[in-house]
A protein has these predicted regions:
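Bacterial N-terminal signal peptides that target proteins for export
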Residues: 1-8
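Bacterial N-terminal signal peptides
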Residues: 8-16
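Predominantly soluble domains enriched in secretory-pathway, periplasmic, or organellar proteins
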Residues: 16-320
Length: 320
């Protein structure tokens, strides 16, 4: 009987350990540098660049896949997508496009890569198994940020010049709804439960908080010329880059109040939250650096020099 009790206790302990979050996770940031056509790979725990990868001309957008061990970089002037193997941090494929890619996102099922073609007003859907099969849908002028629901069935597109969000059914690749927001929406993020979509509206200095069930929209003022947004799912706060006053606004989603305004490098653009370190990383176009914010204190913790004109537009953090 004692042996049975011991085995039961041991089994329970083993199960608890197996289900606990890993303390050995390592996160890496892939920062596109539009001015020198490179990507800086940052070891977040070490706060240093471990490799600089040459990509196509004028890289802007970034998306990563843990399952595929890939980072995808949109090269707006090169009219291509650079595919980086994140195990070796080397470019293994270049996908040629007849267009000008900016926003980019991979579906959670890892089967489809979506690309916003800035000047052709369309979204491209690329099969990640061969990078050859492409579908497309016209959305609106200047499509920018992209977000995809966790079931990979819904794609949200920030349509900058029509001041709305296009909702796309990914199976048919057709627009099913348009959600009016503020002036010139650009960056997007989506909550893990898919119920809250957040749009950053550049020209009226706001973010729109969208209920994806009712499509009710709340509006919150932020800093000057906001650009991108990241969500901290641990405490439901969002971080918004304000490009013209060199700050990040920290906003509580429940109260819709600003908790802090953090000074960062010049012209902050791309921003992502790293769950492994509980840090927020901000790419500064005007200062060629990444600012690291401690999400526990909302204080600036470190800065990391990167390449020329860092943008990192998209979900740029990969955790192994």
């Amino acid at each position: 009987m004692n042996n049975l009790k011991f085995m039961a206790a041991f089994s329970l302990l083993f199960a608890l350990i197996a289900c606990a979050p890993s303390k050995n996770q390592t996160s890496f940031a892939y920062i596109s540098n539009q001015g020198d056509h490179t990507v800086s790979v940052i070891d977040i725990a070490e706060s240093k660049v471990i490799k600089t990868v040459n990509v196509g001309k004028a890289p802007v957008g970034v998306t990563v896949s843990n399952a595929l061990n890939r980072a995808f970089i949109s090269n707006v002037e090169g009219q291509s997508i650079s595919v980086i193997d994140t195990n070796t941090n080397a470019v293994i494929e270049t996908i040629a496009l007849k267009g000008d890619p900016v926003g980019i996102a991979i579906a959670p099922d890892n089967k489809t890569l979506y690309v916003a073609d800035w000047f052709s007003d369309r979204i491209l859907a690329i099969d990640t198994s061969n990078y050859k099969s492409q579908r497309e849908v016209i959305v609106a002028k200047a499509p920018a940020g992209l977000m995809i629901s966790t079931d990979s069935k819904t794609l949200y597109v920030a349509a900058r010049d029509t001041n709305d969000i296009a909702v796309i059914d990914t199976a048919s690749l057709s627009v099913t709804k348009r959600i009016p927001v503020g002036k010139h929406p650009f960056g997007l993020t989506l909550s893990a439960d898919n119920k809250t979509l957040i749009s950053v509206n550049v020209y009226d200095n706001t973010v729109s908080i969208i209920n994806t069930d009712s499509f009710k929209v709340d509006t919150i003022k932020v800093g000057e010329h906001p650009y991108c947004v990241a969500l901290n799912p641990n405490n439901q706060t969002i971080y918004v880059t304000n490009t013209q006053d060199d700050t990040v606004s920290v906003i509580d989603l429940a109260s819709k109040k600003t908790l802090a305004t953090i000074d960062v490098g010049m012209t902050p653009e791309g921003i992502s939250f790293d769950a492994a370190s509980n840090h927020v990383l901000v790419a500064s176009w005007g200062q060629n650096q990444v600012s690291v914010i401690d999400a526990n204190t909302n204080k600036l913790k470190a800065t990391i020099k990167t390449g020329d004109k860092s943008r990192a537009f998209g979900q740029f953090i990969l955790t192994k």
